[in-house]
């Protein structure tokens, strides 16, 4: 018995090898799990559930097949695909979760999240995040014609890539105080997240005892997953 976690696949039509690797992962690994949790940035970009991109339908069908095989799939939005909505969730069989969720798995209480909210030193990003998560702004954006949304998304990605070139690694990583506050607030000693693309297992000393923060890697040249069982919490990097 085990539960699997993944994040930061950044699927797109331009990276067919990653898509193939993900579909293989669903068939060979996820199919044997108690559940699959996707902690954001499954897609490189998401401009609305009405986008007719064929890749989206292919991924939805594969996730639906997983659900129909008896493996539930849960999704937390990332900074790239925060507009994934109820329509895609229904089509894919995924269950949408809030940005922070506490799980009780095999005797461990684990806080799961995408991870971008922990990067509080990057004030410019946090300000941008507050804007794009405003329900009114999202409603206005989704009401635009698809071609407008495509252009806006492309400009935003280019601007983000340019901005990140001038940011230090420390600013783009999690803030230790933000991590501790989140774990104390939820009364947990385990945290799993993605976003930073820095796979590692961190041992922490909180005010209420020892804790662990496990970070998923991005799917670039290899896959990354966390396997939680009654015996262990394992970070696993694997070839496509």
Curated annotation (Swiss-Prot):
Co-factor requirement: Mn(2+)
Pathway where this protein functions: Glycolipid biosynthesis; lipid IV(A) biosynthesis; lipid IV(A) from (3R)-3-hydroxytetradecanoyl-[acyl-carrier-protein] and UDP-N-acetyl-alpha-D-glucosamine: step 4/6
Similarity section: Belongs to the LpxH family.
InterPro entries named in the record: Calcineurin-like_PHP_ApaH, LpxH-like, Metallo-depent_PP-like, UDP-diacylglucosamine_Hdrlase
Domain of life: Bacteria
Major place of residence: membrane
The protein's name: UDP-2,3-diacylglucosamine hydrolase
Alphabetized GO MF terms: manganese ion binding; UDP-2,3-diacylglucosamine hydrolase activity
């Amino acid at each position: 018995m085990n539960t699997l976690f993944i994040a930061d696949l950044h699927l797109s039509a331009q990276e067919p090898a990653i898509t193939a690797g993900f579909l293989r992962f669903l068939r060979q690994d996820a199919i044997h799990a108690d559940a699959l949790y996707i902690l954001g940035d499954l897609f490189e970009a998401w401009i609305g559930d009405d986008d007719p991109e064929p890749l989206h339908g292919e991924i939805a069908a594969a996730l639906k097949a997983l659900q129909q095989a008896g493996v539930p799939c849960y999704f937390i939005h990332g900074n790239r695909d925060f507009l994934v909505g109820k329509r895609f969730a229904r089509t894919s069989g995924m269950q949408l979760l809030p940005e922070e969720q506490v799980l009780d798995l095999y005797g461990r209480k684990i806080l799961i999240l995408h991870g971008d909210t922990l990067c509080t030193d990057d004030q410019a990003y946090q300000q941008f995040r507050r804007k794009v998560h405003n329900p009114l702004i999202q409603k206005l954006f989704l009401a635009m014609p698809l071609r407008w949304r495509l252009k806006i998304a492309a400009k935003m990605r280019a601007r983000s890539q340019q901005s990140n070139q001038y940011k230090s690694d420390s600013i783009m990583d999690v803030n230790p105080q933000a991590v501790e506050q989140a774990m104390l607030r939820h009364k947990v000693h385990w945290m799993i997240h993605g976003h930073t693309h820095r796979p590692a297992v961190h041992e922490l000393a909180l005010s209420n005892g020892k804790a662990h923060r496990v970070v998923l890697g991005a799917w670039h040249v290899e896959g990354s997953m966390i396997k939680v069982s009654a015996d262990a919490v394992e970070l696993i990097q694997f070839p496509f």
